[in-house]
Amino acid sequence: MKLIASNKKAYFDYEILETLEAGLALLGSEVKALRQTRVNLKDNFVKIIKGEAFLFGVHISYLDTIHAYYKPNERRERKLLLHKKQLLKWQMEASKERLSIVGLKLYFNQKNRAKIQIALVKGKRLHDKRQSLKEKALNKEILADLKHHFKG
């Protein structure tokens, strides 16, 4: 698995409940741009329209070598390739419990297919974010103390 991009902001802003791997329907120039890691996953989300899942808000820059006539929209919606059962299950859960679906990681799998890891998420409140920052700082401090203790 070759990681292309990661949505670090999603781990901070949301509580991740469940993850799933999905394929992407891309143009050839977009795949070439992905190989050069010209992608930004910040502020993306998945919307289910008429029984199909679409990824919005992902910015894939076009290449410099592309002809001026053919310049695709860099922020266009991209279709996600999922099984119907998975899609319907997540659609029901998201609408019932007021959850969102966001993309976490974009990568190439062993067969060199572009895949995205999507997650069913619940938004964190401000005090939850503060709590996670405190835990992160505490863990960092503990690791530093352990390292110092065993080192000398």
From Swiss-Prot:
Taxonomic lineage: Bacteria, Pseudomonadati, Campylobacterota, Epsilonproteobacteria, Campylobacterales
One Gene Ontology term, aspect cellular component: cytosol
Single biological process term from Gene Ontology: trans-translation
CDD domains in alphabetical order: SmpB
Subcellular localization, as worded in the UniProt entry: Cytoplasm
Keyword terms, alphabetized: Cytoplasm, RNA-binding
HAMAP family in the record: SmpB
Species of the source: Helicobacter pylori (strain J99 / ATCC 700824) (Campylobacter pylori J99)
Name this protein carries in UniProt: SsrA-binding protein
